[in-house]
Amino acid sequence: MAVALAGLARSLHALDWERCPFDRSLVVTVPQAARAVAEGSVDLEDLDEEREGWSGERLLAELERTRPADEDLAVCHGDLCPDNVLLDPRTCEVTGLIDVGRVGRADRHSDLALVLRELAHEEDPWFGPECSAAFLREYGRGWDGAVSEEKLAFYRLLDEFF
């Protein structure tokens, strides 16, 4: 599954982002996050473990403090995780995508952050650290960049607002 997900991510990220009509870059998503805090729509009961108990204001302050200076724009799914990818069980080939409401041009780390978080879950019998490592190996075959741990952390934080 990790190899199929990596191939999907690589294919999406290889599309011409300049032709994508949907903007999910930080000039759009950070103000949306601030609006979510102001409206009280951030689900503070469903935060990642390292942020349990945080207020919306604290989340937003951390988001602003850690905002990356640059973006490696690509066409992104926006919520790339195994639950949103349909696979043929016989061939393990991707047959479709669901939950595509956040598709748009964004930093590729926004997809990488979410899929790697999901694949690394040790308590899930289907996944674990070896799955995220396999994903990175396969994804890296078609990309000359480097994964930024700081950006991964930032985009996981940004996901808390949506």
Predicted regions and their residues:
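Short runs of predominantly hydrophobic/aromatic residues within well-ordered alpha helices
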Residues: 2-5, 109-112, 154
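Conserved residues at the C-terminal ends of beta-strands
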Residues: 15, 88, 118
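Active-site activation/catalytic loop segments of kinase-like enzymes and analogous catalytic loops
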Residues: 110-144, 156-162
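Active-site acidic catalytic loop and adjacent metal/ATP-binding pocket
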Residues: 58-110
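An alpha-helical support segment within catalytic cores of ATP-dependent transferases
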Residues: 2, 7, 11-78, 144-148
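Alpha-helical scaffolds flanking conserved acidic
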Residues: 148-155
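Pocket-edge positions in alpha/beta enzyme catalytic cores
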Residues: 48-51, 104-107, 127
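Glycine-rich, flexible loop segments associated with nucleotide phosphate handling
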Residues: 50-54, 92-96, 129-133
